[in-house]
Structure formats: C-alpha cells, structure tokens
Regions:
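Acidic/His- and Gly-rich active-site-bordering loop/insert found
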Residues: 1-101, 110-113, 117-126, 130
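Divalent metal-dependent hydrolysis catalytic cores, especially in the metallo-beta-lactamase
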Residues: 128-138
Length: 138
C-alpha cells in the first residue's frame, strides 16, 4: 500500500484523537489523563512503551522487521496545554476549567500516534523508531 493512501485512510481516526485530546487539556507535569489516553492507544496498537518520565512522559518503540541493527531515530510530540480558559464553542471544547490546548499540542500528539500506528503496521525497515511523548513543555 502506498504510504499516502494509508495515511489518508487514518485521517478521520487521527482527527478523532485530536478532538478527544483537545477536550482533556492538562498543564505542567500533571497530564495524567492525557498520559493514560496515549498509553491506551499505544497498547491498542501493540506498541511497547515505558512511562513515568518527568512524571507523565512516555517513550514508545517500534522495531523494524529487517534485522537487529542499532540504527534508531526519535520522533517527539509535546502534550501539555496552557493555563487559559477556552472560549470556543464546539463539542470537543475543554472539559477542564481554565485549561486549553491553544498551541497545537493535541495535534502534535495525534500525529505522533498516527506515525506510531502506521510504522507498527508497516515495519519493513531496519532499526528502531522511538516515539517520545513529552509532558510539561510549556
């Protein structure tokens, strides 16, 4: 399957993830629900991960099927929100008073989950890809 076709097929799913993440913004190093959400998706995709970095951070890994080389690359997304009220009116607006995803971290996290899912399904490469979900970036 051509990469762009599969990514296009995943678009609505990634959009749903972004909206779900948008509705549960958390700040600082206390992104417990967001971390739980990310870990549930990684588990759903059968991707191994370690958690607890800086409290709520996660590092996942997808190993390629073409050998056991030590080649690796890391992809990162931040997942914290900002301490500000959301004034938008749509179904996925913030459910956490005084917190909002106002700078795209919900989108960053959704895209990284999409990359992780895609590469776990299409692991015809050598080495490993690490997915770093970073809390408390703001």
């Amino acid at each position: 399957m051509i990469v762009s076709n599969r990514i296009n097929q995943m678009f609505e799913e990634m959009k749903t993830w972004r909206q779900e993440l948008h509705s549960i913004p958390e700040i600082g190093l206390e992104e417990y629900e967001t971390s739980k959400y990310i870990k549930s998706k990684l588990s759903e995709f059968n991707i191994e991960f370690k958690d607890g970095y800086a409290n709520t951070g996660i590092v996942a890994r997808v190993k390629g099927s073409q050998g056991e080389s030590d080649k690796s690359i890391g992809l990162r997304a931040d997942f914290d929100a900002l301490p500000m009220p959301e004034k938008n009116e749509f179904k996925h607006k913030s459910t956490n008073e005084g917190m909002m995803h106002a700078c795209g971290h919900d989108g960053h996290t959704s895209m990284l989950l999409g990359a992780a899912k895609y590469l776990s399904e299409n692991n015809d490469f050598d080495g490993s890809v690490y997915f770093i979900f970073q809390p408390g970036e703001e």
